[in-house]
């Protein structure tokens, strides 16, 4: 089975499958362009209820996490003040250790909140990767088309 390099690297089937998937995607996602659903709020009530339930669940999980972080931070700050007092050569400073610890604490607490409503399961990861590969092969196809046009 001696295959030439051209046969080995032939991705025409993959490109055809991608073009078919792209055509199908455009067909189903062009409903708004054809004037089908113009108001995004006119979706089914069931979808609204499900998304609201997921949002409430996410909010409650975030609040629980924030409470745990606050409790851990309080115990950490208490320990930090004792460490800072003994770490200083003099043992005392002009500034209170609680003030320094609070300033340090504020620097670390300015992390942006996570995006609500997302769950990172295997299906979601596969969806993200499929969009990545779709974009990659779209760019590849466009690049090849442009290079073929330049040759002509």
From Swiss-Prot:
The keyword Protein transport does not apply. Keywords: mRNA processing, mRNA splicing, Nucleus, RNA-binding. One of its GO terms (cellular component) is SMN complex. InterPro entries: Smn1, SMN_C. The keyword Zinc does not apply. Residues 91-108 have a biased composition (Basic and acidic residues). One of its GO terms (biological process) is mRNA cis splicing, via spliceosome. Changing residue 130 to D: Abolishes homooligomerization beyond homodimer formation and results in abnormal SMN complex formation. Decreases vegetative cell population growth. This is SMN complex subunit smn1. Homooligomer; may form homodimers and homotetramers. Part of the core SMN complex at least composed of smn1, yip11/gem2, gem6, gem7 and gem8. Part of the SMN-Sm complex. Interacts with yip11/gem2; the interaction is direct. Interacts with gem8; the interaction is direct. Interacts with proteins of the Sm complex, including smn1, smb1, smd1, smd2 and smd3. It comes from Schizosaccharomyces pombe (strain 972 / ATCC 24843) (Fission yeast).
């Amino acid at each position: 089975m001696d295959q030439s390099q051209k046969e080995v690297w032939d991705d025409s089937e993959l490109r055809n499958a991608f073009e078919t998937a792209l055509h199908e995607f455009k067909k189903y996602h062009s409903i708004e362009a054809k004037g089908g659903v113009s108001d995004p709020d006119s979706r089914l009530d069931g979808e609204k209820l499900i998304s609201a339930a997921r949002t409430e669940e996410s909010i409650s999980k975030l609040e629980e996490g924030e409470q745990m972080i606050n409790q851990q931070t309080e115990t950490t700050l208490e320990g930090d003040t004792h460490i800072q007092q003994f770490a200083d050569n003099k043992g005392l400073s002009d500034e209170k250790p609680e003030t320094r610890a609070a300033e340090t604490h504020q620097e670390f607490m300015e992390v942006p909140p996570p995006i609500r409503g997302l769950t990172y399961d295997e299906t979601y990861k596969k969806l993200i990767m499929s969009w990545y590969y779709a974009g990659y092969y779209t760019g590849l196809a466009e690049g090849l088309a442009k290079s073929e046009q330049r040759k002509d």
